[in-house]
From Swiss-Prot:
It comes from the Bacteria. This is Chaperone protein DnaJ 1. Zn(2+) 1 binds at C145, C148, C202, C205. Zn(2+) 2 binds at C162, C165, C188, C191. The gene is dnaJ1. It is found in: Cytoplasm. Keywords: Chaperone, Cytoplasm, DNA replication, Metal-binding, Repeat, Stress response, Zinc, Zinc-finger. InterPro entries: DnaJ, DnaJ_C, DnaJ_domain, HSP40/DnaJ_pept-bd, HSP_DnaJ_Cys-rich_dom, HSP_DnaJ_Cys-rich_dom_sf, J_dom_sf. One of its GO terms (biological process) is chaperone cofactor-dependent protein refolding. Participates actively in the response to hyperosmotic and heat shock by preventing the aggregation of stress-denatured proteins and by disaggregating proteins, also in an autonomous, DnaK-independent fashion. Unfolded proteins bind initially to DnaJ; upon interaction with the DnaJ-bound protein, DnaK hydrolyzes its bound ATP, resulting in the formation of a stable complex. GrpE releases ADP from DnaK; ATP binding to DnaK triggers the release of the substrate protein, thus completing the reaction cycle.
Length: 381
């Protein structure tokens, strides 16, 4: 995948040129080998120098924003202080150019480059996540030009070295400043950093070697996937410029809420409402489980509100091992809100026989009362 140049500098993709420059200057002061001799800092300094070079160049930044890597396959030429930049890089960030006549050249980026990875978001219901599913999807992507087969040229013509940059892919300018002679490099405006031009381009792809098209792809989603997980389809992304190798296609799963079950990892949770009498005497209820069909659940006599009955191995399959999680059934005891005369009489009789049962006030911090259970649920304490 393409390197995260924005992340290396700690800026967002929408950062302005000034914000990128400030971020690089701050990091350069901290990590430059003349200031910080630590090997890890030196490696980091090299990375941020490359990131700044890419993001400070409009064309290279455009390639990054499209999901590519402008330095992919580029040959590094020249160097500075010990192979990791040098003072010229820092002065370039501070003052807008090289220092003392030195500059770092990366060479042409190459006409044939790897393609970008693509991302497809797919909505799945809980049953599809549990069983796995194969779906046909249509994607708009870059494919190999079927007229020139990726060459980008018309007929038997071929690319030729760029006259403007002499095939180097960049042009340099020298200016005088208070710091002395300042040399700056930028991508060649004629060949856009590639180093070659196509005098007679393909009429279908206009020299790019690829065209936009809609493709139908079969996507196999394995059993046990969860929300936010990505399935990788190798070489199913965009074909690269000049007919370069295709990137990968990533299918990101978005699991839709279920009417009954709530998923927690490989475990499932649901709630059953049990009448007060059944909670006291015991009963059997049925639940239509995701993979097991209708399952019977025994409510033991004397079940209290908030009790949890666990069915081992009745949850979701694990993505890799296939072992099943658990199904946790939360019991909600329903107290009748309206009673007729006969119901009232029977309950009063029952109360009379249970005279020892009286209301009791207890601390909410002990004993597992409702408040305690709620607090534990939401805070873990």
């Amino acid at each position: 995948m393409a390197r995260d140049y924005y992340g290396l500098l700690g800026v967002s993709r929408g950062a302005s040129d000034a914000e990128i420059k400030r971020a690089y200057r701050k990091l350069a002061r901290e990590l430059h080998p003349d200031v910080n001799p630590d090997e890890a800092a030196q490696a980091k300094f090299k990375e941020i120098s490359v990131a700044y070079e890419v993001l400070s160049d409009p064309e290279k930044r455009r390639i990054v924003d499209l999901g590519g890597d402008p330095l992919e396959g580029a040959a590094a030429a020249g160097g500075g202080f010990g192979g990791f930049g040098g003072l010229g890089d820092v002065f370039e960030a501070f003052f807008g150019g090289g220092f003392g006549g030195g500059t770092t050249s990366r060479g042409p980026i190459g006409r044939v480059r790897p393609g970008s990875d693509s991302l497809l978001r797919m909505r799945l219901d809980l049953e599809e996540c549990a069983t796995g599913v194969t779906k046909q999807v249509t994607v708009d992507t870059a494919v190999l030009c079927d007229r020139c087969h990726g060459k980008g040229t018309n007929g038997d013509s071929a690319p030729v070295p760029c006259d403007t940059c002499g095939g180097r892919g960049e042009v340099q300018t020298v200016q005088r400043s208070l710091l002395g002679q300042v040399m700056t490099s930028r991508p060649c405006p004629t060949c856009r950093g590639v180093g070659v031009v196509i005098p007679d381009p393909c009429h279908q792809c206009m020299g790019d070697g690829r065209v936009r098209a809609r493709r139908e792809i079969s996507v196999k989603i394995p059993a046990g996937v969860g929300d936010g997980m990505r399935v990788r389809l190798a070489a199913q992304g965009e074909v690269g410029p000049g007919g370069g190798p295709a990137g990968d296609l990533y299918v990101e799963v978005h699991e839709q809420p279920h009417d009954v079950f709530v998923r927690e990892g490989d475990d499932l949770h649901c709630t059953v409402s049990v009448p007060m009498v059944d909670a006291a005497l015991g009963a059997t209820v049925t639940v239509d489980a995701i993979l097991d069909g209708v399952s019977e659940i025994t409510i033991p006599p004397g079940t209290q509100p908030g009790s949890v009955i666990t069915l081992r191995g009745h949850g979701m399959p694990h993505l890799r091992s296939g072992t099943r999680g658990d199904l946790h059934v939360h019991v909600e005891v329903v107290v009748p809100s309206r009673l007729d005369a006969r119901d009232t009489e029977l309950l009063r009789e029952f109360k009379g026989r249970r005279g020892r049962d009286v209301p009791e006030v207890r601390s909410t911090h002990a004993g597992g009362g409702l408040f305690s259970r709620l607090r534990e649920t939401f805070t873990g304490r």
